[in-house]
């Protein structure tokens, strides 16, 4: 096997293995990658159509929702086929501040093809109270699976997050899940995620918290799956299989750590102010 072919085979095994471990760990929503306009390359988690994921999903678990992300203006959804249930269950649409209307339009076309839809309101910290109420009103009309607060620049402190969460919770219909997607520019990703969960602990609002193994993500990275699930097990009576999560880290994450760098650093800690 050539070195290039061997590397592709390795990357395919990593993607497949991580998805398999996460579903065995009882993770409810597994984001498998992105949908992009370009054709899928073997061993990449940038897909063109949902069938590209069939290589990586080793027997769907009915308790899991398998998701891919799209940027509101970087994917031609006309190529998206009707949902046949074999790979993706849902698509997360991320849109920037002041582009909610456009994001919901593409979301509507995706929903019409039989996919569940989640929305990510990037840079939610930029929204005023009236902006948040208007966003909630639009989301209520659409009726997606959920809407996530996104701390795009890792600039939020707990009071910022809870202020936004309170407004959205007060105005979102109760059958719509509210989520939080953190970035770790100030090393606040885990702390804010815990605060978000604790705030809703006595609520009947269903919530979501985004995380990744070892906090892997662009730049400063995200909240870590291993810490979030441990916290939820110990403090909120959840039943995530930490052995599967830690085994995924031992088996697969070394490969990423050798090739890529992410996580807190001083430049990222000051970048959110500029």
List PLM regions with ranges:
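Single conserved hydrophobic/aromatic residue that forms the stacking wall/gate
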Residues: 1-5, 9, 274
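Glycine-rich, proline-tolerant flexible connector loops at the mouths of alpha/beta enzymes
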Residues: 29-53, 152-155
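Hydrophobic faces of well-ordered beta-strands that scaffold small-molecule active sites
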Residues: 30-32, 65-70, 89-93, 117-121, ...
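Alpha-helix-loop-beta-strand connector modules within alpha/beta enzyme cores
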Residues: 43-67, 112-116, 164-178, 231
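Acidic (Asp/Glu)-rich catalytic clusters
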Residues: 55-62, 79-86, 107-112, 137-142
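Active-site-adjacent beta->alpha loops and helix N-cap segments on the catalytic face
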Residues: 97-111, 126-131, 155-167
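Conserved anion-binding
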Residues: 112-133, 142, 148-150
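Catalytic alpha/beta core domains of metabolic enzymes, predominantly
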Residues: 152-259
């Amino acid at each position: 096997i050539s070195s290039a072919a061997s590397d592709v085979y390795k990357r395919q095994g990593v993607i497949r293995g991580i998805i398999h471990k996460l579903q065995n760990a009882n993770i409810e929503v597994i984001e498998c990658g992105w949908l992009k306009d370009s054709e899928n390359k073997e061993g990449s988690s940038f897909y063109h159509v949902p069938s590209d994921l069939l290589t990586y999903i080793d027997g769907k678990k009915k308790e899991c929702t398998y998701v891919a992300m799209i940027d509101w203006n970087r994917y031609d959804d006309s190529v998206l086929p009707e949902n046949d249930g074999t790979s993706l269950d849902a698509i997360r649409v991320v849109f920037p501040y002041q582009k909610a209307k456009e994001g919901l339009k593409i979301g509507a076309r995706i929903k019409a093809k039989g996919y569940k839809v989640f929305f990510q309101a990037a840079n939610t910290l930029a929204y005023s109270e009236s902006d948040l109420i208007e966003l909630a009103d639009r989301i209520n009309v659409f009726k997606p699976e959920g809407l996530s607060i996104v701390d795009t620049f890792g600039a939020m402190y707990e009071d910022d997050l809870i202020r936004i969460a309170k407004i959205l919770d007060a105005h979102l219909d109760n059958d719509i899940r509210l989520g939080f997607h953190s970035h770790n520019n100030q090393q606040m990703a885990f702390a804010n995620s815990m605060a978000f969960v604790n705030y809703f602990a006595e609520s009947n609002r269903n919530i979501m918290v985004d995380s990744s193994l070892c906090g892997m993500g662009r730049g400063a990275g995200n909240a870590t799956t291993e810490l979030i699930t441990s916290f939820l097990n110990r403090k909120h009576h959840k039943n995530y299989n930490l052995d599967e999560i830690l085994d995924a880290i031992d088996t697969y994450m070394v490969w990423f750590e050798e090739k890529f760098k992410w996580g807190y650093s001083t430049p990222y800690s000051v970048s959110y102010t500029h």
